[in-house]
């Protein structure tokens, strides 16, 4: 929520909230929230229970990935850096969710929502930059074959998308983020033996 500067009606930009929510296989929820307004930063962390050693290590291993995701979406020319979060330790953690909301001006917030668990991944982007929605169902092992075949299939999808984007004069920044999302959602599977079924929605 935008907040006016004390004593004025003027909202101080930029406003940002970055949230990482992790659920362990033992059922513990951990949430880390970074909020900033103008030059002020607030950090909150809460856990629904006590973590064991393996869970603490698994969470610690996501620290750089969390920072990469924040740096990417907060950049002057935003990019998606979600690969690190997608490669969470699935032997200890059940799911990872990343939410980002950044408001640079009166045009409203740019939001990003990423989810990954052992069978699915999704990323949704909405705001002034545009809208995209990419989801992957990794339960169908018959769709993409081995890693080499999968890489070739992804490359083919990207080439088709480039042609369609060129014909439709798509926004270059949004097109780049879509390709990043598509590639990252279909790479480095949590369970290598599982292959994904890819679904595309609203670009």
Question: What residue spans do the PLM features occupy?
Answer:
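Type III/flagellar secretion export determinants
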Residues: 1-203
């Amino acid at each position: 929520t935008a907040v006016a500067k004390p004593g004025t009606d003027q909202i101080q930009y930029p406003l940002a909230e970055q949230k990482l929510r992790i659920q362990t296989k033992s059922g513990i929820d951990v949430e880390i929230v970074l909020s900033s307004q103008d030059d002020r930063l607030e950090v909150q962390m809460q856990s629904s229970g006590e973590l064991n050693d393996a869970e603490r290590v698994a969470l610690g291993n996501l620290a750089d990935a969390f920072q990469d995701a924040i740096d990417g979406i907060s950049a002057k020319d935003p990019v998606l850096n979600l690969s690190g979060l997608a490669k969470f330790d699935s032997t200890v953690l059940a799911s990872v969710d990343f939410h980002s909301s950044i408001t640079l001006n009166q045009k409203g917030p740019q939001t990003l929502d990423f989810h990954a668990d052992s069978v699915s991944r999704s990323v949704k982007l909405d705001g002034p930059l545009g809208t995209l929605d990419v989801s992957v169902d990794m339960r169908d092992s018959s769709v993409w074959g081995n890693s080499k075949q999968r890489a070739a299939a992804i490359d083919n999808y990207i080439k088709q998308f480039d042609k369609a984007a060129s014909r439709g004069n798509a926004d270059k920044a949004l097109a780049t983020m879509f390709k990043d999302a598509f590639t990252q959602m279909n790479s480095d599977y949590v369970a290598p033996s599982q292959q994904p079924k890819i679904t595309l929605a609203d670009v």
